[in-house]
Structure formats: structure tokens, C-alpha cells
Amino acid sequence: MDTTRAKLKTEHPLPPLPAVAHRLLELINRDAPFDEIGAVLATDAAMAMRVLRIANSVALRGATPIASLTEAFLRLGTAQLRQLVLGLVFIHHFPRRGAFDYVAFWRHSLHVALAAQQIERRSEGLNNSGQDVYTAGLLHDIGIAYLNLSATTRYKQVIVEARSSGEPLEVVEQRLLGVNHAEAAAYLLEEWRFPANIIAVCRFHGRPEEAREGHRDLVRLIHVADELVWGLGYDNGAKRVGPEFNPQDFAKVRVDPTQHEAIVAELKTLAEQVESCLA
């Protein structure tokens, strides 16, 4: 990994995030109370308006519209608003470059985050915090966006070759770039001081058996959620075809496979929330 880190540091500069985005990530990562998060949000009018718009779309329908960040906090609670802010920071502040399909990428990522939460709630014995589950799902493929940003022309060739050959994306990345998106994501989140379990998800969600025992439950959960979302037809913007999902895979995360239809139905009700985040 030392050689990989050196290559990433030399050839793939960290994405330039606005100061407000860095501050929000810092607060979210240390589970800061919402009054601190709200104070920073208030300095970014566009972000604050997005939070209020989405909060109104997911709050109690028919209730009085939410008009302030404080009211959003009281109506939705700290956990849900923290998730909302995290998603908006990445979706609207992570730099975009080239012809890469960022909308498909973030749609896939948001669905994985929500799917992982639905699966985890039905699991018998998993002990991950809801925030960790959401964050891990949202960022599991962040290395794709990072490599596209830092090596746009070469990454376009990665996408073309991966689609035409049918090879796994990380295999083509390794051949053409000398690094893959799992390694890139781990490096990026280490530099941004994300928790070790989130970093482990980025590095190992494609091969959960390689994660260390303390992280394996969360890694396996995101692995299953990712396959479920691919099975629902949400590609990640880089490849259009992904792994097939078998409901029996729910057993890997201690969920009864008969819950498959209920989980899919719940995800369909959350589709509006996903599209609101992308708007």
C-alpha cells in the first residue's frame, strides 16, 4: 500500500472541496450536535435551501412546511439530517470533470446507502450504527469519482475498455492506471480522516472475506446492498452491467431471504428522496 499511496499522492491530487464542505465533513465524522452543523450550513445559502427542500419532501406529508433548519432538525431528527447533509456535501461539492455520468453514479450510491439501512434493520445480530451504514453505502465507490477527476482522459479509456471487454472495472483500472478505485477510495478517505470501518468498506466491499473481522459485518452488508441495487438496474456510471443479485445472499448478513420483496418495496418508496438529493 505504501507504493500505491505514493503513486496516488504523486499522480492523483486530492479533490479541492470548498471550506464549508470540509467543515461539514469534520462535524459529521465526529458526530457533532446539529446546532454546530446548522451553524455551518447557515453560511452556505444554496446548501441550506437544498436541505430544506429535501426535508420537506421526506417529512410528514400534509404537515406544515418546514421553513428553517431548526424546524428541520426537530421534525426529522439529528441522524436523518446528518445523513442528508453528508449526501449533499458529496453530491454537490465533489468536483466533476469530463463526460462521466455523475448522476448515475450518485443515484447508485444513494440507493446502496438506503438499501444497506433497510437490510441492516431486518438483520438478526448486526451491530452497525445507522450513520456508519449510510456513510459506507454512500461512499463505497467514491474512488471511481476520484480517479475520473484526477485522470479524466485515461479514466475515459478505462470505462470504454471495461464496458467492451466485460472485465471487472478494478482489473482494467489496475492495468491502465496502476491503481484501482478501491485503493484510491481508501487513500482519499484516510486523508480526509474518515473512520477505519468506512475505509475498510471502500477497500474490501468487492471481496468482503478479506476485511478484518471487526469490519467484516459492515463490509459484507454493503457488498450485499450493492449487488441488490445493481439487480434493480441502478448502474454506477462507469459500468452498465453489474453482478446479478440472488435473494439467498441475504443470508450472508443474517436476513431472511423472504424479506427481499419488502426491502425492494421500501426502496421504491424512497426513490423520490434519492431524486431530490440529485436535483
What is each residue range found by the language model?
Residues M1-A6, A21, P247-A279:
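Terminal helices and disordered tails flanking the catalytic cores of nucleotide-processing hydrolases
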Residues M1-Q157, A162-R163, E167-P243:
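Conserved alpha-helical "signature site"
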